[in-house]
Amino acid sequence: KKFLNDKIYWCASSTHEGEELIAAKAYLILKKKIKNLILIVIPRNVQRVSEITHMFSELGLKTHRHSLNKKIPTDTNIYIVDTYGETKVFFKVCKVVFLGKSLTLNGGQNPLEPARYNCTIIHGPNVSNFHEIYNLLGKNKIAFKVTNQNQMIKKINELLTKNIPTKNIKNKIDKIGDEILNKTFVEIKKFIRQ
């Protein structure tokens, strides 16, 4: 956490093959505009970490793996979370999260966990498993769909450089939940009356 104190950072979480490369290339462009920028990558499958680390190295990026439990070098570009069960720790400190399985694969990942931690969510168009939730989050400006790397860069730059409040995201989520629950009760009552 101390390492992040003077940094600006965003997270690419639950990433699948191909998405880490997109995030890393976006990072390289954003780094030219935003000083002290760090990308936190949380791959869905930690068995791919060696492959991911090598790919980042090929791009000239310096990485640090969370499992090393060592002091983080000051020239680190990408912090790789290669352990299970700690995602929420990083959601608590990140303002912006790209959720994977949405740019290169179909289905998407559940956006409610990062939203509960006041994260603004960026996702690709392939979110069929959570379509309704993403629509609700999109209408409430909690989640933003991007279809390519350029859109990702533009949206992340906007979210990190503009003073967009995120503290009320959890309140918006609670309100959305209440609305869904009320609609569900209305539908159940209709069904019971039949």
Per-range role (PLM):
Residues K1-Q194:
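Nucleotide-activated sugar donor-binding and catalytic core shared by glycosyltransferases
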